Amino acid sequence: MNVTFLGTSSGVPSLTRNVSSLALKLSQSSEVWLFDCGEGTQHQIMKSNIKSSQIKKIFITHMHGDHIYGLPGLLATLGLSGNSKGIEIYGPSELRSYINSALKSSFCKLSYPLHFVEVENYASKNKILFENNKIKVNCACLKHKIPAYGYRVSEKDKPGIFDIKKAQSLKIAPGPIYSELQQGKKVVLADGRTFDGKEFCGPPRVGESFVYCTDTVFSQSAVSLSKNANLLVHESTFSEEDENMAYEKLHSTTIMAAKTALLSNTKKLIITHLSPRYTNKNAITPSDLLKEAQKVFPNTQLAKDFLTTEIK
């Protein structure tokens, strides 16, 4: 899996950062899942390597405008292009009425169905939000001025590496049988020989996991959601010098984000949702924010618009 940052500013866009949105590209699939959709997100998609036709699911963290104002326009564009068979939208219960009202008021009729999933019950009861044979999604309540939710996408363990040389040495012809063996299945060849796929595969490979937490002040539920994740993307609206403001507005400082990564044993942290007050021309710069976080959690990276990173 990989993620592409489409917007990394908090509250309002700046000349270099759009408001919140992130695209997750699934492994071995053309599917893209979008996390938040601030104003201008579809313009950001057009400038990136993401194809809007690949978007199948959209996850919204909360109902503040910098996370949702881009949704009606994006959904309308997907309808006009005629390339969408349906979109699943996950988020707070208010999201359905917001989207339906915006589309109705602008006389927009989509050519594809929208499927809404309200996440409150899943988050409060720690229920799996989505699951198939390759992946599952969990969500958790965060701590913000309005209800907000973090999301975790976890790949299921993958089959071990297939030993092709061993199969070839036993004169097993390449083809669909290799796929069955790689899945650990027992197969019977045309000559009557029987093989157990487990004998040709190494140990299962642990699937990657990605966690997206914004908006929130430091939250124990974010720590629990991020446990042993490969990548945590966490908001860092404020510098540690502005900690009082973070508590007042229920946003995170760089130190809070880093502490979440440290306590959850996350492999890598990327900080995003930066306040526009921190620029290279001001007393505190984005580079300073990165250094603050790295003091607590060294494997921290600073998000910027159009950054793409592999989850590993």
From Swiss-Prot:
Active site (catalytic residues): 66 (proton acceptor)
UniProt: Zn(2+) 2 binding residues: 66-67, 215, 273
Comment on bound cofactor: Binds 2 Zn(2+) ions.
Its job: Zinc phosphodiesterase, which displays some tRNA 3'-processing endonuclease activity. Probably involved in tRNA maturation, by removing a 3'-trailer from precursor tRNA.
UniProt subunit comment: Homodimer.
Family recorded in the similarity comment: Belongs to the RNase Z family.
Protein name, UniProt field: Ribonuclease Z
Gene: rnz
